Amino acid sequence: MRFLLIIIGGFWLFSSYTPEQIKIEDFIWIQTFCYASTLIIGLCILVKHLERPYLQWDFSFGVSVIKKSWPYALLIVLMNLYTRIDGVMLERIHSNGAFEAGVYAQGFRLLDALFMFGMIFAGLLFPIFSKQLKTSTAVVLDLVKTSANLLLGGIVVIVFVTVCNASLILGWIYDDIQDAIGPFQFLMLGFFPIGMNFIFGTLLSANGNLKILNSISALGIIANISINIILIPEYGALGAAIATFTTQGLTAIAQFLYCIQKFKIPKKPNGILKFLLLATGLYAVSTFYASSTYLMLIQIISGLGLIFMLSLIDLKAIKKLILTSK
């Protein structure tokens, strides 16, 4: 559904066939169409594997399903709360809340769009992890390494590109951007821990460790609210963005450390060193070409080159990941 929404929504935004004045109702209809299409496709696939359907209410089975499902539902609610409560608190706490909430939303919309791509990646990983956890933990650890290198390596490049070119990127979309640059940069810094959550949170979900995930998410909400209460009155949208970055970082570290302990992940410094070298290389390139008109292009090319040089993208490992998913 998300992939369909991204494709149709992106086409509607940038196509020459769309009207000059785009209304919010257009996106409501696009989202409704995507949900309906996904439902119909899912039903068509499901019907092939079922006998003649009939309605029958089994109370005990329904209760069993609810008991098994509610931890997942609670996790989704908690994660959405500590990810999206900042905008609500910003509007309520700050003296100029409506304006600051608008400034925050300018940057958050772009983060949310990238978040959707990450969710697609996590959705692909979940069944792979679930399947392999039943057979071999060693295979799962290889998959975690491959997926982490692939996703987080790309995210490091995205973070450098968006942070260093914040005014340019925001200027493509909005007219008044000066107040939004700082919040946008902190929000994009938070995309790296979000990527970590996609990997390690998905691994824990596939292993059924919902209790620890819900506990971490609950602590994330407490931390997020506390930091927002402290920072928003003085710093407004920037304070809310810092709160988001800090909260995502804390939850990512907690999930990562628990995964190390739970799955006995080897503590090899090489993996972390590769990401540090990638970040250092991109920082050097960004500093040296800071005044260049082609900074973004240089960063992208350099980032991709470094990713391959550091073997963060291993084509054989990716092929193995694809074959494992089948």
Give the residues covered by each predicted segment.
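Membrane-proximal transmembrane or re-entrant/amphipathic helices at the cytosolic face
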Residues: S286-K326
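Hydrophobic alpha-helical transmembrane segments
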Residues: M1-K48, L219-A223, A237-Y258, S302, ...
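Specific pore-lining/lateral-gate transmembrane helices of multi-pass inner-membrane transport
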Residues: V103-S217
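Helix-terminus/linker motif at the lipid-water interface of multi-pass membrane proteins
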Residues: F14-E20, V77-L114, K131, S167-D176
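Residues that define the loop-to-transmembrane-helix transition and helix capping
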Residues: I24-E25, F99-G102, I181, L210-K211, ...
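Interhelical loop/hinge segments that connect adjacent transmembrane helices in multipass membrane
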Residues: Y17-I30, G42-T83, L124, I128-D142, ...
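Residue-level signature of transmembrane alpha-helical cores of multipass secondary-active transporters
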Residues: Q31, Y35, S64, K68-N80, ...
